[in-house]
Design a protein with these regions (language model features):
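Bacterial N-terminal signal peptides
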Residues: 12-23
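Ankyrin repeat A-helix N-terminal signature
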Residues: 35-39, 68-74, 101-107, 135-141, ...
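Terminal, low-structured helical/coil segments at or just beyond the last alpha-helical repeat
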Residues: 490-566
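Bacterial N-terminal signal peptides that target proteins for export
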Residues: 2-14
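N-terminal segments that cap or nucleate solenoid repeat domains
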Residues: 27-68, 77
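Conserved ankyrin/ankyrin-like repeat signature
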Residues: 44, 76-77, 109-110, 143-144, ...
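Ankyrin-repeat boundary/"N-cap" motif
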Residues: 29-35, 58-64, 91-97, 124-131, ...
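Ankyrin repeat domain, specifically the short helix-to-loop turn at the C-terminus of the second helix
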Residues: 49-54, 79-87, 112-120, 146-154, ...
């Protein structure tokens, strides 16, 4: 959560505290004025004042009558209390003052009254030293902001938790009018928020941001270190982005994870502001600390997965933006050699993506694949684990229901394209996995038949012990048909997906070609060797499949070492 986001939390906690106090059955002794003010009862407040009741006597949580008047934006009640000596700087036990409430409401008239009565426009509102100007900027109420600025509010004060300024708060809430007011008041357009050493550290690991420093360098998986322009790009605020750039904002400044504003915009699905930033000469080849470029993220977002931990799904098509980046010089062969960290958190065993082309191939996206190839993308680049573009197109490690891909017919067109471009159908990765094994794991019979017709080897073996026994892996080398049976699975929790039509097709062709299925029954049936009823040396794959389904249903436990069939 950044400093600007914490402002929303501040509001929720504050309002919750006030409502909770309102619901209490009894109040602190002597808090009659505050009690009456909480109900908006001006008549009772006036009567109590006439009887010399203490207008500053707080309720149990420190809330005074003026707090309630300000929260309700009751100007007449506030006048009455201030005239009777109400303390305009009183803070409740959370540190909330009437000025903070007025700023949160964006009430210019109330702010004027409080400031005229002596409230300090720069007084910290809580333990993190948020200011009234930050609160007003978050609401986007420019008249309230002007009142504070005219009273001496400083636009470049940074709160102490995330190091954010009022300009960042305005940009993060998509308030271009507020952004303009602050720029005109001298707000620093290249100010930086604090630096967080581990991505999501604040929200998930409880780590506080670091104090910023002029020589701070990005670290792996870091976050923070954002400028106002980055906040605008992240939230998709084109108008604010234009004003910030015109005021001197650095277009190619780098965030804590080394993304520039363009990368942040695309990562968050904000393609309009991304297009503007390209026009503003943003570096289209700026790689972040995970080595992903803006082009990669745009390709990725076109075929974004859906899962519980993804808070949004981009509906706009980034294809026009991808074309614009390529025309602006984006390198389609920039090596990524990485797996997006979000997929790591989801537990996906996704292959390492080498380039944007491999990501497009994995999705089976023929239009995007052709576009990248037309701009010089190399179809023969392999990942640092040896995976080929063809393996990716065949769905290596694709998980149905998790990954998002194109229809089978379109995926097959991508497969054919790579074969026609000369990618070897039998080229194996560092685990010995081939394109045919990937296709068998997908269960796509048309793809399997095409690859077999093009010479894919049904008698090939992987290297065994793939993924160190993770995801249902076997210590015994597996054949392509085993991937259709479900032994060579890439699904988390070892969930088995059996493709019977694919097994039948591959078994038939293997029989026609005299290829023996040699995988042991122990491997095929996973920890059920003592109950063996099928001889793997004479049984067909289909017979073994039926026995295996009978023995273990649709769940296999990963074999972890050296078991022999008894």
């Amino acid at each position: 959560m950044n400093g600007a986001g914490r402002g929303s939390l501040w509001r929720v906690l504050l309002c919750g505290a006030l409502v909770a106090v309102a619901a209490l059955p009894a109040y602190a002794a002597g808090s009659e004025v505050a009690d009456a003010a909480s109900k908006g009862d001006r008549t009772s407040v006036r009567s109590l004042i006439q009887r010399k009741a203490d207008v500053n006597a707080p309720q149990v949580d420190g809330t005074t009558a003026l707090h309630w008047a300000t929260r309700a934006d009751d100007l007449d009640l506030a006048d009455m209390l201030i005239a009777a000596g109400a303390n305009v700087s009183a803070a409740n036990r959370e540190g909330v003052t009437p000025l903070g409430l007025a700023a949160m409401n964006g009430s210019a008239p109330m702010l004027q009254k409080l400031l005229k009565a002596g409230a300090d426009p720069n007084a910290p509102l809580d333990q993190f030293k948020d200011t009234a100007l930050m609160m007003a900027s978050r609401t986007g109420k420019t008249d309230a902001m002007r009142v504070l600025l005219e009273a001496g509010a400083q636009p470049n004060i940074a709160e102490t938790w995330g190091g954010t300024t009022a300009l960042m708060w305005a940009a993060s809430e998509r308030h271009p009018e507020a952004v303009k007011v602050l720029i005109d008041a001298g707000a620093e357009v290249n100010a930086r928020s604090k630096f967080v050493a581990a991505a999501n550290g604040r929200g998930f690991e409880g780590r506080s941001p670091k104090a910023d420093a002029s020589d701070q360098k990005p670290e792996d998986f870091a976050s923070g270190w954002l400028t106002p322009l980055m906040f605008a790009a992240r939230e998709g605020d084109v108008e604010s982005a234009r004003m910030l750039v015109a005021a001197g904002a650095e277009v190619n400044a780098l965030a804590g994870d080394a993304k520039n504003a363009l990368g942040l915009a695309i990562f968050n699905g904000n393609y309009e502001v991304a297009s503007y930033l390209i026009d503003a000469k943003a570096n289209v080849n700026q790689a972040d600390t995970q080595r992903f470029t803006p082009l990669y993220w745009a390709v990725d977002r076109r075929n974004m997965e859906t899962a519980p931990n993804f808070p949004w799904v981009v509906t706009a098509d980034p294809l026009p933006l991808i074309k614009k980046m390529l025309d602006a010089g984006a390198d389609p062969n920039a090596l990524v050699q990485n797996t997006p960290r979000a997929r790591m958190r989801e537990g996906s065993p996704r292959i390492v993506f080498a380039t944007p082309l491999m990501r497009a191939a994995f999705a089976g996206d023929i239009e995007l694949t052709k576009l990248l190839l037309s701009h010089g993308a190399d179809p023969k680049i392999i990942s640092n684990d040896g995976e080929t573009m063809l393996e990716a197109a065949c769905g290596l490690a694709f998980i149905q229901g998790y990954h998002r891909g194109r229809p089978a017919a379109e995926r097959l067109e991508v497969v054919k394209l790579f074969v026609e471009l000369g990618v070897d159908v039998n080229q194996a990765d560092d685990y010995g996995i081939t394109a045919l094994m990937a296709a068998a794991n997908m269960g796509d019979t048309k793809m399997i038949q095409y690859l077999v017709d093009k010479g894919a080897n049904l008698a090939a073996y992987d290297l065994g012990k793939k993924n160190d026994g993770a995801f249902g892996a076997s210590v015994e080398p597996l054949m392509p048909v085993d991937y259709a049976i479900g032994v060579g699975t890439f699904v988390p929790n070892n969930a088995v997906i059996i493709h019977e039509d694919a097994v039948a097709l591959m078994a038939r062709v293997m029989k026609e070609r005299g290829i023996t299925h040699t995988t042991s029954e122990c491997t095929l049936r996973g920890f059920t060797c003592a109950q063996a009823r099928v001889d793997p040396k004479v049984a067909s794959p289909a017979e073994i499949l039926r026995a295996r389904k009978l023995a273990i249903g649709h769940q296999i436990e990963g074999v972890t070492g050296g078991l022999e069939a008894k």
